[in-house]
Swiss-Prot record:
GO terms for cellular component: membrane. It comes from Oryza sativa subsp. japonica. The gene is LTI6B. It is a multi-pass membrane protein. Keywords: Membrane, Transmembrane, Transmembrane helix. Induction: Early induction by low temperature and abscisic acid (ABA). Late induction by drought and salt stresses. This is Hydrophobic protein LTI6B. The chain crosses the membrane at residues 8-28, 31-51.
Amino acid sequence: MAGTANCIDILIAIILPPLGVFLKFGCGHEFWICLLLTFLGYIPGIIYAIYAITK
């Protein structure tokens, strides 16, 4: 199942978007973008996290 997101990854991304991205990518630029978007608004953080995890 390499390259695909499972249900747990998506669920974590919905509950805590930066955590879901961190678990997938570590502390890279994806994490910081997601953290910033989550601070600016929870919904943009969720959308970006799901996008980043599933791409």
